[in-house]
Amino acid sequence: MKYLASFRTTLKASRYMFRALALVLWLLIAFSSVFYIVNALHQRESEIRQEFNLSSDQAQRFIQRTSDVMKELKYIAENRLSAENGVLSPRGRETQADVPAFEPLFADSDCSAMSNTWRGSLESLAWFMRYWRDNFSAAYDLNRVFLIGSDNLCMANFGLRDMPVERDTALKALHERINKYRNAPQDDSGSNLYWISEGPRPGVGYFYALTPVYLANRLQALLGVEQTIRMENFFLPGTLPMGVTILDENGHTLISLTGPESKIKGDPRWMQERSWFGYTEGFRELVLKKNLPPSSLSIVYSVPVDKVLERIRMLILNAILLNVLAGAALFTLARMYERRIFIPAESDALRLEEHEQFNRKIVASAPVGICILRTADGVNILSNELAHTYLNMLTHEDRQRLTQIICGQQVNFVDVLTSNNTNLQISFVHSRYRNENVAICVLVDVSSRVKMEESLQEMAQAAEQASQSKSMFLATVSHELRTPLYGIIGNLDLLQTKELPKGVDRLVTAMNNSSSLLLKIISDILDFSKIESEQLKIEPREFSPREVMNHITANYLPLVVRKQLGLYCFIEPDVPVALNGDPMRLQQVISNLLSNAIKFTDTGCIVLHVRADGDYLSIRVRDTGVGIPAKEVVRLFDPFFQVGTGVQRNFQGTGLGLAICEKLISMMDGDISVDSEPGMGSQFTVRIPLYGAQYPQKKGVEGLSGKRCWLAVRNASLCQFLETSLQRSGIVVTTYEGQEPTPEDVLITDEVVSKKWQGRAVVTFCRRHIGIPLEKAPGEWVHSVAAPHELPALLARIYLIEMESDDPANALPSTDKAVSDNDDMMILVVDDHPINRRLLADQLGSLGYQCKTANDGVDALNVLSKNHIDIVLSDVNMPNMDGYRLTQRIRQLGLTLPVIGVTANALAEEKQRCLESGMDSCLSKPVTLDVIKQTLTLYAERVRKSRDS
């Protein structure tokens, strides 16, 4: 099988790409910060440049104004010159003008010639200059005006202000400029000349402008002006600490107002540029260089770089801090994302890959075939070796059918018989694999299972046949055993009703006991067989648990008295008066437990305690017998198990009684438990659910309230039960210790009273008393310990109180025996067995009934046609015409007389079949005289009522 490509490499690459993404994000933030800072820097540079330009405009205006003054003065000077003599002709002079001061500029300068030759002109010009000074010089801020002759090289100084002049410095500067001017090319000699000399303090100097004066196209003189220049006037008011420097055409500093650390020198980068803005070498200063036309001078404004960055320094720090924090955050986020996403994902991928490989190895080594088929065409995409082998075993038709089933998606499995007779079961589920609709198929070789199912089916058929044979065996055995046994028990029962010679009655009793034991053994075996074959059914109906317990104790009390034991029956007041269940099976279970208790108890007593336990009715049977070892308690309810090898083996039994009890209680939705200790006795507890329980009204006997009863009872359990029962009836209960009673008091005791009781009566509970309470002498009553719950009824009789009870089980039975008067009833006995037919006739005769007999169903119909019959008592299984067909024929004839079936069949369906055929009831053989009496009394009363109506 091919393994899927690992995607751990993809996850690792994704992890590194995530790191790269974090780095790119950080770089993006950094570039954004740099861009923002650069933009802020450019904005700051733009502001500084704008301020530089505004300041340079002031310097430009200063130069331009001086140039304009030069033009005006030149115009004045040229217009004042006389074209004839080359001197100025004063016009309208009112006073004598002062002669200007003359200064030689060179060693060969002839100031006397200039003074003599141009005296008149200079005086006229001086007068005009004085006039111009008085009216205009203040506006132009001029210090002096001077005129230099072109031939004599002597300077005539027209001072406009009284300002000290450094003569040597000024003459030296003029000397240098005159030489430069004289040596300049012909084209440049006609232009103006500008220069600045340093002043008395930094930032203050003298600005000189020199222009040629021509007369008749001939250079006659050079006119110049001197003006004080203050660099501080070239700044705009503001907070920017800028420096300013004026350079000549060679880049030499003429005047500067800067700090000592910033000395501006001409930079070749911007010397030839009219305007240049940028940083100096080393990025120490930001400068703006602009020419100052019409002069050849240029002005340079500068500001230190740290001043430029001062306003954005905090922005830079914030940007650096932001980038550091962003980098740390991105790195932390990347690391956290790796630890929480990528690294676990890589671990999961590794585990998933290992799991995938492990699953594939499991699939490859699986004992079944596993494959993936494409849904569209059934092509095998992936499979293990076993599936490949199985698929090759399929025929072409099988593959087509499998493909159709997969495409249809109607079923999830299909059984296929291969060409070599191998049974394959193919189950599948639909899924997606590699972007295709597929079916995951599992192929299992079920040949062994098919063979096993066939074998099991054969075994089931054999078991069903065996069950049918077992049912037939039960029916046959039940009929064949119960039929002769009924003849034995029934005749012995009849024989005991006769007067027998002395000694014969003992033999008859022994025979009756033995036959009863045989009947019990046979009944247990048949019941167990019916339970095992699920033939036994629970028949729920409403019954009184109190009556069932009274009936059980009445049946076993003679046996208990015979063994000189005590049988205490405590029925608590909370026991319901009626509930839904099977009273016959409950009686069978309790009778079995009580019989075992009597059997295994030689001394002491047996206690039957009935009470309500929540939603259950609890029935406890406790004895003081030999007990059961703990190791054998766990097997106590196993079939055919008998306890021990010692004294218990001395008791007869099949070992089926408790097993049957456990099965019956389980069928009634109850449970049974045992608690035993060797030498101390055993206690069996049966619990059945209280279905449809009806409880008595909680009220005492009217008339007994306030009566006093004295208790002198040695048995603690009996004493406690009597005290509770009497107090519930409103009786005052007092322990008797020899006190003097009142005439209305009653003494209740379980021992012989030594002296005469002075009260109303004495009730003695005796273990050997059987039957209803008996008055041996006036005021002296004997009561059975098996029915202490009947004591309130006896007290009502003693106090002559008429008792009304909603529970007849607590009432005292009538002492008068009913006289049998049944000779008005004609009963037809139908049985093919002559002994049983004769026995039934004798039993009916002993009960006072009139009787006719018939051999089978045909004979019975003949008798019915000729005689009046009130009740039909018929066997079920007979030749010619059985009891079922006889009943159906009777109903077809329109006869409504009661038909009672008698059968020896032990199956549960037998009674149901009898009822379905039309019978009113069904009795199981052997039928005792008491059962016949109870049944016929019921139906005879019904017939009499029908006659009367």
Swiss-Prot record:
Protein name per its UniProtKB record: Sensor histidine kinase RcsC
The species this protein was found in: Escherichia coli (strain K12)
Residues in compartment: Cytoplasmic: 1-19, 336-949
Protein topology in the membrane: Multi-pass membrane protein
Post-translational modification as stated in the protein's UniProt record: Autophosphorylated. Activation probably requires a transfer of a phosphate group from a His in the transmitter domain to an Asp in the receiver domain.
Regulation: The Rcs phosphorelay may be activated by RcsF. DjlA, LolA and OmpG might act as a regulator of the phosphorelay. Activity is probably up-regulated by YmgA/AriR, and possibly down-regulated by YcgZ, all 3 are connector proteins providing additional signal input into signaling system.
Modified residues (4-aspartylphosphate): 875
Gene Ontology CC terms, in alphabetical order: cytosol; outer membrane-bounded periplasmic space; plasma membrane
Main location as per UniProt: membrane
Histidine kinase domain sequence ranges: 476-692
